[in-house]
Amino acid sequence: MVLIRVLANLLILQLSYAQKSSELVIGGDECNINEHRSLVAIFNSTKFFCSGTLINQEWVVTAAHCDSTNFKMKLGVHSKKVPNENEQTRNPKEKFFCPNKKKDDVLDKDIMLIKLDSPVSNSEHIAPLSLPSSPPSVGSVCHIMGWGSITPIEKTLPDVPYCANINLLDDAVCRPPYPELPATSRTLCAGILEGGKDTCRGDSGGPLICNGQFQGIVFYGAHPCGQALKPGVYTKVFDYNDWIQSIIAGNTAATCPP
C-alpha cells in the first residue's frame, strides 16, 4: 500500500483516497537536542500531525497535504510531553500554495509556505535553515528527522524526534514502485536500497537535509515503511526557490514551475 505520510485520523478528514500516513523515522535514533533547530512541530488542536522547516524568522515550509484548520506551530520542541523554556508557539498568518497546482491532486506540487503571525527569535534550540543554493547530487548523504512512527507497520509515535542518514538516489529508482507519480513531478528519491531506514507516519512536511542544505520535504512513500527498493519521495525544494522568494518579497501572484 502506498500512502502520503500523514497521521491516519487526519487522512480520513482531509484526503479522499488511501495515502501514506505521517511516520516517525524508521531505523534512526533520538536526535541530539540541538540537531533539529529548524524543525517545526505542527499541531491540530492538541495533537501533533506534521512537521515543517523554519527558513527565516517569519516563514515555514511544509507539505501542502499538511494543511488543516486551526493548527499551531511549535518551535524549539524536543520532547512533546516536557516543554522547555526555549519553545515558541506561532499561528499561521497566511498560507500559500502553488496557484497552478492541480485542484484536488495531492500528488501535484506538494508544498505549502506559511507566514507566521509574529517572528520567532533564534535561540539555543531554534534557528532557520536557508533555502538550497544548488540542487543535490545523487549519492549525497541526507539527514531525515521527525516525530513520526518508529515502527514500519503499527503506528508508534515517539515523544522525541528521531534522526537517520539516508542516500539521495537516482529518480529512476522511485519510478517502478510509484507509477502513479507524474513523470514531470519535481521530486527527489531518497532512502536505503536494502531498506531499514525511512521516513514514516507522522514525518510528513519535515525536511530532507543533504550536505547541510534544505533539499526536500517529506511527501510520499510505501507502507510498511522502510521496505527494500521502495525509497521515500520528497518534494524538491530547489525547484521552488524562485516561487518561495517571490512570495516572501510580496509577489503573492507568483506561480510555481510546471
Swiss-Prot record:
Cite the EC number: 3.4.21.-
Where the record annotates domain Peptidase S1, the positions are 25-249
One GO BP on record is: proteolysis
| Active site: residue positions | H65, D110, S204
**From which domain of life does this come?**
Eukaryota
The secretion signal range is 1-18
Q: Name one GO molecular function term.
A: serine-type endopeptidase activity
SUPFAM superfamilies assigned: Trypsin-like serine proteases
Q: Cite the propeptide residues by number.
A: 19-24
Keyword Methyltransferase included in the entry's annotation: no
InterPro entries in alphabetical order: Peptidase_S1_PA, Peptidase_S1_PA_chymotrypsin, Peptidase_S1A, Trypsin_dom, TRYPSIN_HIS, TRYPSIN_SER
Specify where it is mainly localized. secreted
Entry's localization field: Secreted
| Tissues of expression | Expressed by the venom gland.
Where are glycans found on this sequence?
Answer: N44
Q: List the disulfide bonds.
A: C31-C163, C50-C66, C98-C256, C142-C210, C174-C189, C200-C225
Cellular component terms (Gene Ontology): extracellular region; secretory granule
The UniProt keyword set, sorted, is: Disulfide bond, Glycoprotein, Hemostasis impairing toxin, Hydrolase, Protease, Secreted, Serine protease, Signal, Toxin, Zymogen
- UniProt record similarity statement: Belongs to the peptidase S1 family. Snake venom subfamily.
Quaternary organization: Monomer.
Protein purpose? Snake venom serine protease that may act in the hemostasis system of the prey.
For this entry, the protein name equals Snake venom serine proteinase 8
What is the protein's species of origin?
Crotalus adamanteus
Its taxonomic placement starts with: Eukaryota, Metazoa, Chordata, Craniata, Vertebrata
